[in-house]
């Protein structure tokens, strides 16, 4: 990944939160 935009950070953060909830 050569593009680091706020949208990408937000997407990655939301994905990690989703995985965290799914693994509970």
UniProtKB/Swiss-Prot annotation:
Cross-link (Pyrroloquinoline quinone (Glu-Tyr)) at residue(s): 16-20
Isomerase recorded as keyword: no
Signal peptide bounds: none
Paired cysteines (S-S): none
Pathway stated in the Swiss-Prot or TrEMBL entry: Cofactor biosynthesis; pyrroloquinoline quinone biosynthesis
One BP term from GO: pyrroloquinoline quinone biosynthetic process
Keywords: PQQ biosynthesis
Entry function: Required for coenzyme pyrroloquinoline quinone (PQQ) biosynthesis. PQQ is probably formed by cross-linking a specific glutamate to a specific tyrosine residue and excising these residues from the peptide.
Similarity remark: Belongs to the PqqA family.
This protein's name: Coenzyme PQQ synthesis protein A
Gene it is expressed from: pqqA
């Amino acid at each position: 990944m050569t593009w680091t935009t706020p949208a990408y950070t937000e997407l990655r953060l939301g994905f990690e939160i989703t995985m965290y909830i799914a693994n509970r």
